[in-house]
C-alpha cells in the first residue's frame, strides 16, 4: 500500500465557521496532528464575498478543504502515504469542528502498479 485517500463531503455545516479563515487554519493544523501527520506548510485563501480554500502540505502528502458557506458545504481531501497515519481521524475532527449535520466519506487505498498486479487475479484461458 502506498497510502490512504479520504474524500469527505460535509453538508449543513456552520456557515460562519466555513467562512472564517483563521478558524480553518487552526482546524486544519489540528486535523493534521490528529491524523499523525507532519505539517510542512499551510496556505489558505479567503474569497469574496465568501468561501475559503486551504491546502496543507504534509510530509506524508496533503490535506485540502474548499468551502461554500452560502451552501453550508465543504469538500475535503486527505491523502497520507504509508500506514502510520490515520486520515479518517482528520476527517472526523473536521466533521465535528465544522458542525456538519450530514456527511459522506469515501476512503480507499492507493497502490503501486506492482501491488495491483499481485492483487488482480486473471482467469485462466
Curated annotation (Swiss-Prot):
GO CC term (a single one): cytosol
PTMs per UniProt: Is synthesized initially as an inactive proenzyme. Formation of the active enzyme involves a self-maturation process in which the active site pyruvoyl group is generated from an internal serine residue via an autocatalytic post-translational modification. Two non-identical subunits are generated from the proenzyme in this reaction, and the pyruvate is formed at the N-terminus of the alpha chain, which is derived from the carboxyl end of the proenzyme.
Pfam families: AdoMet_dc
Cofactor needs: pyruvate
Biological processes, Gene Ontology terms: spermidine biosynthetic process
Cofactor notes: Binds 1 pyruvoyl group covalently per subunit.
Pathway(s) served: Amine and polyamine biosynthesis; S-adenosylmethioninamine biosynthesis; S-adenosylmethioninamine from S-adenosyl-L-methionine: step 1/1
Residue positions where Pyruvic acid (Ser) is found in the record: 61
GO-annotated molecular function: adenosylmethionine decarboxylase activity
List of catalytic residues: 61, 66, 81
Protein EC: 4.1.1.50
InterPro entries the record matches: AdoMetDC_C, AdoMetDC_fam_prok, AdoMetDC_N, S-AdoMet_deCO2ase_core, S-AdoMet_deCOase_pro-enz
Keywords associated with the record: Autocatalytic cleavage, Decarboxylase, Lyase, Polyamine biosynthesis, Pyruvate, S-adenosyl-L-methionine, Schiff base, Spermidine biosynthesis, Zymogen
Catalytic activity: S-adenosyl-L-methionine + H(+) = S-adenosyl 3-(methylsulfanyl)propylamine + CO2
EC class (word): lyase
Domain of life: Bacteria
Keyword S-adenosyl-L-methionine applies: yes
Annotated site residues (Cleavage (non-hydrolytic)) in this chain: 60-61
Similarity remark: Belongs to the prokaryotic AdoMetDC family. Type 1 subfamily.
Function: Catalyzes the decarboxylation of S-adenosylmethionine to S-adenosylmethioninamine (dcAdoMet), the propylamine donor required for the synthesis of the polyamines spermine and spermidine from the diamine putrescine.
Complexes and interactors: Heterotetramer of two alpha and two beta chains arranged as a dimer of alpha/beta heterodimers.
Protein name per its UniProtKB record: S-adenosylmethionine decarboxylase proenzyme
Organism in which the protein naturally occurs: Prochlorococcus marinus (strain MIT 9313)
This protein's encoding gene: speH
